[in-house]
């Protein structure tokens, strides 16, 4: 481990202790004229960096892949993945892990350059990224962090001064992504597909040491690892559902072992409540629709369990039984987390038998009347029942009476109930049309002020402040259906 004290680099590279089949060492491809367009000050400080130093030319060169900090060990990670149900051997096709930053508190975070050039895993891709998708990842990942949802984060975005060609010519950019690690379900699939039990065991041991050291002494630590990942993903997916987040591409290579949300390509937030909501242009069958996300998470975790079978038990039948037993627990864990979250969204402290029915009735009405998901809960939180089709309906008025009497029956005061609702119902989400507005200004005009204002509003989604009002409105009904596209 080496240290550059001027900017605060303090890099280690524990991933290289794994067998070399898990990665390829390769330097980033330099770019012509990098320019820093966004730096995450608060994240930089928490990682042990000095933000003002990071704005200097020498550090911008690092974010661009034109230079490396002391202790850097750039590598592309190998992994596999089921992409829309089809298995492929994959890997970092346009990203490089330059090292793991050790923070002042001793925590370890991957520092990855996304869009840093081709790698052996690029599969005919150019290894580059466009400015729009990189800024989009910055905005959405920071919004998720503010919503208290586990996520990778964005430290910096630099433009490269070079065009990137997709459907059209676009300005190129590189995002510096920060993650607890980039170990995925697909990393374990890769190890299992190669057929080396020793390599699979090495990966599992490394993952336990890095993410779940408390289970190292467990009688069957590999079963315990599976249990921990299931627990983390059940919690994560419940949090997604509770705020109306739709990931869009829940392939196994986008499911992290740490339980963080990763890959903000075709993601979006739901406006009108609809279980079938899909935004991704490539998800033509609705595989990853809003209502399918819990089921797809269980499917992805079953692929992790399959990969672990060779090390779960020496007897294959027993290993298979262990895997099946553990996967069967996901749905209960998810349902419990989601139900607890929905109760908080409605200010329910105690438990009553009809709570499930109360929640389901509201959601059915919201779907029937195409009610805005975020704003419905926002209105209930503020107790301002606005003139909408949902709130004007006789069935809602009946439901509202039931809900109010339910609040009155619990020991906690209504004031406390509404306060809990305020802490669990965001006033603001990154509305798709407002994100696009910010990206349009930045990419076409070089005007980052629209994005800065949006980021400021999103930084405290539970504030219910006056300056957020402008960002609460859903898109105009005349707007065509929103579609998202994978940045690659």
From Swiss-Prot:
Catalytic activities: L-seryl-[protein] + ATP = 3-O-(5'-adenylyl)-L-seryl-[protein] + diphosphate; L-threonyl-[protein] + ATP = 3-O-(5'-adenylyl)-L-threonyl-[protein] + diphosphate; L-tyrosyl-[protein] + ATP = O-(5'-adenylyl)-L-tyrosyl-[protein] + diphosphate; L-histidyl-[protein] + UTP = N(tele)-(5'-uridylyl)-L-histidyl-[protein] + diphosphate
Keyword Transferase carried by entry: yes
Gene source species: Bacillus cereus (strain ZK / E33L)
Keyword rRNA-binding: no
Protein encoded by which gene: ydiU
Residues at which Mg(2+) binds: 254, 263
Protein name per Swiss-Prot or TrEMBL: Protein nucleotidyltransferase YdiU
EC number: 2.7.7.-, 2.7.7.108
GO MF annotations, alphabetized: AMPylase activity; ATP binding; magnesium ion binding
Cofactors required: Mg(2+); Mn(2+)
